Amino acid sequence: MVITLANDELTVQFKQLGGALSSIKDKDGVEYLWQGDANYWSGQAPVLFPICGSLRNDTAHYALKDGQEASGVIPRHGLVRKKEFELVEQTDTSV
């Protein structure tokens, strides 16, 4: 789903899949974000969090405050680019 915010100057759109800002248009309809081109890449501009790229065996290792070590799986390019974001609140100026 795409969420839209608009005022007299700008219209912005966000995709719930990946939580990405997907469009910024001015009042004349001029687009300021790259809209993607399937000839080069199937995507647009995903949110890559907390990493860009991949980890060895898709595994992050980290130290806990108590000195213990832990690990967890983080897929290539992070956790959020293919996740559906839930709209919790929308106002005239924020989502």
Tell what function each PLM region has:
Residues 1-95:
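Surface-exposed acidic/polar loop and edge beta-strand patches at domain peripheries
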